[in-house]
UniProtKB/Swiss-Prot annotation:
Binding site for Zn(2+): 106, 161, 164
Biological role: Catalyzes the reversible hydration of CO(2) to H(2)CO(3). The main role may be to provide inorganic carbon for the bicarbonate-dependent carboxylation reactions catalyzed by pyruvate carboxylase, acetyl-CoA carboxylase and carbamoyl-phosphate synthetase. Involved in protection against oxidative damage. Acts as a CO(2) chemosensor and induces CO(2)-mediated filamentation. Essential for pathological growth in niches where sufficient CO(2) is not supplied by the host. Necessary for white-to-opaque switching at low CO(2) concentrations.
Originating species: Candida albicans (strain SC5314 / ATCC MYA-2876) (Yeast)
Gene field: NCE103
UniProt-recorded name of the protein: Carbonic anhydrase
Location in the cell: Cytoplasm; Nucleus; Mitochondrion intermembrane space
EC assignment: 4.2.1.1
Cofactor (UniProt): Zn(2+)
Paired cysteines (S-S): none
Example of a GO biological process term: phenotypic switching
Length: 281
């Protein structure tokens, strides 16, 4: 398959490469001028406008990028979606959101929900350092309630990742300073509760960090399932909750097996009439 045919294939299909350049387009169009009746079938791929080479290649922007560079990237984003879907996606988004999934992940720039290859309007997102979910964090608790009770999501993913800075910090005794030491306390508690298990990985720090990341996902999923809204929805089989780990070196997700929570029923608070109110008198 020649270069011209590869480029033509990319431009005619919905999963075309974002790496098509102006030179590639010119080559493709010149080639198709020699083909009978083919010009009208080609959808011109949006071209990314660049201010020139920057020191962050192959990424699209850098610390030296200007405001106009960011706006150009936004235009490319819009043009790419319209190229594949017309105005349908933005028309639907203009009418409101109805996401099917809540994604709870780490703030790490490498580990966002982009790995699901979804479109705007599909995923409701909450991210923080080390993808921590606990009952003391009003932000995550509010997001979970809103996602389940208002948006009616059907899937919830809690996703950790390899090479997580919050995990590495929790494996160290070095003080970070500011609010971060307090924020990472839940991960340190997980480390303390699994100290013997983690010591088995002392000869391989990367595997040790990966194991703690998995344990942290388990802890966050367990905390999420104990959330009042999640507990009720799970009892009614209205949602599924999955733990995931994203590998920043490969781009692939893997499932983290979540053990059964023996205290799950203790956190199932509800308004059902058959439940007697506790009264010691």
């Amino acid at each position: 398959m020649g270069r011209e045919n590869i480029l033509k294939y990319q431009l005619e299909h919905d999963h075309e490469s974002d790496l098509v350049t102006e030179k590639d387009q010119s080559l493709l169009l010149d080639n198709n001028n020699n083909l009978n009746g083919m010009n009208n079938t080609i959808k011109t791929h949006p071209v990314r406008v660049s201010s020139g080479n920057h020191n962050n290649f192959p990424f699209t922007l850098s610390s030296e990028s200007t405001l106009q560079d960011f706006l150009n990237n936004n235009k490319f984003f819009v043009d790419s979606i319209k190229h594949n879907h017309g105005n349908q996606i933005f028309d639907l988004n203009g009418q409101g959101q109805s996401p099917h999934t809540l994604w709870i992940g780490c703030s790490d720039s490498r580990a966002g929900d982009q790995c699901l290859a979804t479109l705007p309007g599909e995923i409701f997102v909450h991210r923080n350092i080390a993808n921590i979910v606990n009952a003391n964090d009003i932000s995550s608790q509010g997001v979970i309630q809103f996602a389940i009770d208002v948006l009616k999501v059907k899937k919830i993913i809690v996703c950790g990742h390899t090479d997580c800075g919050g995990i590495w910090a929790s494996l160290s005794k070095k003080k970070i300073g500011g609010v971060l030491d307090l924020w990472l306390n839940p991960v340190r508690h997980i480390r303390a509760a699994n100290l013997k298990l983690l010591e088995e990985y002392n000869q391989d720090p990367k595997l040790k960090a990966k194991k703690l990341a998995e344990l942290n996902v388990i802890s966050s999923v367990t905390a999420l399932k104990r959330h009042p809204s999640a507990s009720v929805a799970l009892k009614k089989n209205e949602i599924e909750v999955w733990g995931m780990l994203y590998d920043v070196a490969t781009g692939y997700l893997s499932q983290v097996e979540i053990p059964q929570d023996e205290f799950e029923d203790l956190f199932h608070v509800h308004d059902e009439h058959d439940e007697e109110e506790y009264n010691p008198h």
